[in-house]
A protein has these predicted regions:
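Helix-enriched interaction subdomains in cytosolic or periplasmic regions
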Residues: 132-141, 149, 437-474, 619-623, ...
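Cofactor-/ligand-binding subdomain signature composed of acidic, glycine-rich
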Residues: 1-49, 70, 78, 458-470, ...
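Non-catalytic terminal/interface segments that mediate subunit docking, oligomerization
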Residues: 397-545, 550-552, 564
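Thiamine diphosphate
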Residues: 58, 62, 139-420, 652-817, ...
């Protein structure tokens, strides 16, 4: 039989192969759609908590999947289920396991039940935390819900390819790149393009010229809000026309395509991939005329805000409906006059549709049974224990009632089982028999298992953890070599760049002038403008660059010029970087080091120390607060030996202070989570960190003149804090505690106080009320006097310590006022 060929995906294939591909695509689209439809019903009937699905976006995702190659990365959002199915990284059963929040990583490989369904990820790590070969698999960075939150990371994922292609020192890292030929694929909804993160990323990608293909799924709405309220001209491609490259300017290649046009979508995505992959030019694909057959999510119906005409238009332009029409209408005449068709008639498609529905129905049932069977086995175990208890307990009537309540729950949760078990234990507080011990053991085992399933992997738990890196002290020459402290930073970074060829450092003014405090002086000239580079004023995407680069095997150090500017990036640090390892159950990591400088210097905008907000928003990131540049340099060396993300806050007023230059630069290490007693004393423990610690040291000298012997502890690390509980050992000796910092009241000092008094049980050793000394609640005022009256001074520290000693021994320490 003569077979004709058809040009598809830039290669010649036979018609039968083309036919098979088209019909398989249609089946994937239908499976995805059925998952959305049935998923909504599962939520509305109470089996799942919430659903947000990709219906109405299926066909363009099929096209994207065909252009997506192994080694590529996706950074998208919660509409991309069809794409994940098309590349073979999501099955229908896994889709429902995620919907039910099944905590088995084998059942829900996206997050082990930690994220709501629709948040997709692939596994970048082996069980021991080491990297897989990312060039041999399809890669999806883990999704987050905040709209446009995927954008900054996308920039870094794309930039990694550019670095791997152009920087010879990293081209040996073949697990992460094949000569920089990988494309980073982004997806976003049309309404979310209104977010600042979108525009910041689009601009940065155009400047950097990175291989990024950005798809905008446009259904004209953002929940209930129409595009006319979202986007100027109601079209993101229209307002981004200025980014279109031309003969004189680098920029973007921009495509506009209807989301229901299967043939044109296939063509456009192949072209886009070729441009990005070969030329390293960013591409924007504006996919229009998409729909939302079920509205935004399970929380409401789009019939509340769309009129009948719009609903009918969406029904007519549903991308699967249009694909179905195209399949039925398709005819190709051969040279001999034969007519080739995909199907003989509608019956062929009905068979596919029934198969798709069957696949999804079975997948849903299997996923639900797998989820429920685990819980039912726990329920059975508790029921048997409670039956035995009811026979012996004086409160047997109450125990039986709880047992019967549990048995009568047709679809129990783990919460149901454990809640009743714990309540029954309350009735047994004065009774003792073997069944009570069984119940206690069950509760303990369940809580331990719950900790593993719900509360692990906040930071690295492997041998690669930064907490496993031991201290290595700096060594010094026999003759002291006192230098400006910034020289220690510069020379240590020089040693780092020489030792670690995968380290790249970037930020505002970090490149040509070597940062505003000269800690990178001359290093761009020595190592090139790829490894040491300037960026625009765009803090969120500086962090995004770092996240993406770190996820692709590089060791980025991203500089935020001042701690005050960190607020621009705090959202992406909190929502994306801090949660990455947790939300993937330890299957992805981004060991990004964020360098900044802060604490006291000058005025409202350059003297901030908002540590309370930072530590409470960044659980999952180490927060390190070295008191000098030697300690800071040691932290960088430690972090590069581990695989955790971290924020290092250098002392802004410390670069010109004199420190002794170590001889083992790049090698000495400051331990993370370990405090340092910088002065021993017997009367009171004072804990501080950063720039303020120097004031505490000065105040301690004055206090010694009046007979008060202060023990000074440098916290060094706020997250984690004092893992060896050395602070409480000091409090047990002095019986008094003062925490001093320059955050606002109730900030990091309150956190430290809780750590020592509550977590370390330091309360039991106190003879005096524990105290904090902080800055005022307002931002620090400008000028020398503004600083003096805004932040703790030497005199403030002296008098606070003296007041505590006066309260303890008023006869010896007379009142000052």
């Amino acid at each position: 039989m003569l077979q004709k060929t058809v040009a598809v995906n830039a290669q010649e294939i036979t018609f039968n192969e083309f036919k098979k591909e088209v019909l398989n695509d249609y089946k994937i689209a239908k499976i995805s759609r059925e998952c959305s439809l049935l998923g909504r019903r599962e939520v509305l009937t109470g089996k799942a908590k919430f659903g947000i699905f990709g219906d109405g976006k299926e066909v363009p995702q099929l096209a994207m999947a065909k252009a997506f190659k192994k080694g590529d990365f996706r950074s998208g959002y919660y509409r991309d289920q069809t794409f994940m199915m098309a590349i073979g990284e999501l099955t229908a059963q896994q889709f429902f396991a995620g919907l039910y929040a099944h905590t088995d990583i084998k059942e829900d490989p996206m997050s082990a039940g930690r994220q709501m369904g629709g948040h997709f990820a692939t596994h970048s790590l082996h069980e021991n935390g080491s990297w897989k070969d990312l060039t041999k698999q399809y890669n999806s960075s883990s999704d987050i819900s905040p709209t446009a939150g995927q954008m900054p990371r996308l920039l870094g994922l794309a930039q990694a390819s550019k670095i791997y292609r152009n920087e010879k020192s990293v081209q040996h890292k073949t697990k992460f790149s094949d000569k920089g030929n990988e494309v980073a694929w982004g997806t976003i909804g049309n309404a979310s393009t209104s977010e600042g993160l979108f525009f910041e990323t689009i601009n940065a990608a155009g400047v950097l010229q990175v291989p990024m293909v950005m798809s905008v799924w446009d259904d004209e709405y953002g929940i209930s809000v129409h595009a006319k309220y979202q986007t100027t001209k109601e079209s993101i491609s229209e307002i981004l026309k200025g980014f279109q490259r031309d003969n004189l300017h680098k920029g973007y290649e921009i495509f506009v395509i209807n989301g229901w046009d299967y043939v044109q979508l296939m063509d456009v995505y192949q072209k886009a991939a070729k441009i990005a992959r070969e030329q390293h030019v960013p591409v924007l694909i504006h996919v229009k005329e998409l729909t939302q057959p079920q509205g935004h999510s399970t929380s409401g119906s789009h019939e509340r805000y769309k009129d009948k005409d719009r609903l009918q238009w969406e029904k007519n332009h549903d991308c699967i409906t249009k694909m179905r029409e195209w399949i039925l209408d398709f005819e190709l005449e051969t040279e001999t006059g034969d007519i080739l068709r995909f199907v003989d008639g509608e019956e062929d498609l009905i068979i596919i549709e029934k198969e798709a529905k069957k696949v999804v129905t079975n997948a849903k049932r299997n996923a639900w049974n797998a989820y429920l069977n685990e819980i039912k086995s726990e329920l059975l175990a508790v029921t048997e224990i409670l039956e035995g208890i009811a026979k012996k307990s004086v409160n047997g009537t109450f125990i039986n009632k709880y047992k019967n309540d549990l048995v009568n729950i047709t679809e129990p949760t783990k919460k149901d089982v454990l809640s009743i078990a714990r309540k029954c234990l309350w009735y047994l507080r004065d009774e003792y028999f073997s069944e009570k011990i069984e119940l206690q053991n069950f509760i303990k085992a369940t809580l331990k298992d719950a900790h593993y399933k719900y509360s692990t992997h906040l930071t690295s738990e492997t041998d690669l953890s930064s907490l496993e890196i031991l201290e290595k002290k700096p060594t010094y020459a026999q003759d002291k070599n006192m230098v400006d402290a910034r020289i220690i930073m510069r020379d240590n970074f020089d040693a780092i760049l020489s030792k670690h060829q995968d380290v790249v450092i970037f930020g505002e003014d970090a490149g040509f002038i070597g940062d505003v405090n000269q800690g990178l002086e001359g290093l761009q000239e020595k190592y090139g403008n790829i490894r040491i580079s300037d960026t625009g004023i765009r803090e969120a995407t500086i962090i995004g660059q770092g996240i993406g680069l770190a996820m692709r095997g590089l060791r980025p150090i991203a500089e935020i010029q001042y701690l005050d500017y960190l607020l621009y990036a705090l959202q992406i640090m909190s929502d994306d970087l801090a949660t990455l390892r947790y939300r993937t159950f330890g299957k992805q990591k981004a060991p990004l080091i964020i360098r900044t400088r802060g604490h006291r210097l000058e005025g409202i905008w350059h003297a901030g120390s908002p540590m309370g907000g930072i530590i409470n928003n960044l659980r999952g990131i180490h927060v390190l607060v070295p008191r000098n540049m030697t300690k800071a340099a040691g932290f960088y060396n430690t972090l590069l030996a581990g695989d955790d993300p971290a924020l290092v806050i250098e002392c802004l007023n410390g670069y010109r202070l004199k420190e002794e230059l170590p001889t083992n630069l790049g090698d000495f290490k400051t331990p993370i989570g370990i405090v340092e007693t910088v002065k021993e004393g017997k009367d009171i423990t004072v804990v501080s960190y950063g720039s303020t610690l120097r004031l505490v040291q000065d105040a301690a000298k004055d206090l010694a003149q009046v007979g008060i012997d202060v023990e000074i502890i440098d916290a060094q690390s706020l997250l984690p804090f004092d893992v060896t509980h050395d602070c409480v050992k000091s409090v047990a000796k002095t019986n008094k505690l003062l925490v001093v910092d320059e955050d606002v009241p109730g900030g990091a000092s309150a956190y430290i106080l809780q750590e020592i008094l509550e977590n370390q049980n330091g309360y039991q050793y106190l003879d005096s009320k524990p105290a904090t000394l902080t800055s005022k609640a307002h931002r620090p005022a400008y000028g020398t006097d503004g600083d003096y009256f805004s932040k703790p001074s030497i005199e403030d520290i002296f008098e606070k310590v003296y007041d505590i000693m006066h309260e303890f021994n008023p006869q010896k320490f007379k009142s000052l006022y």
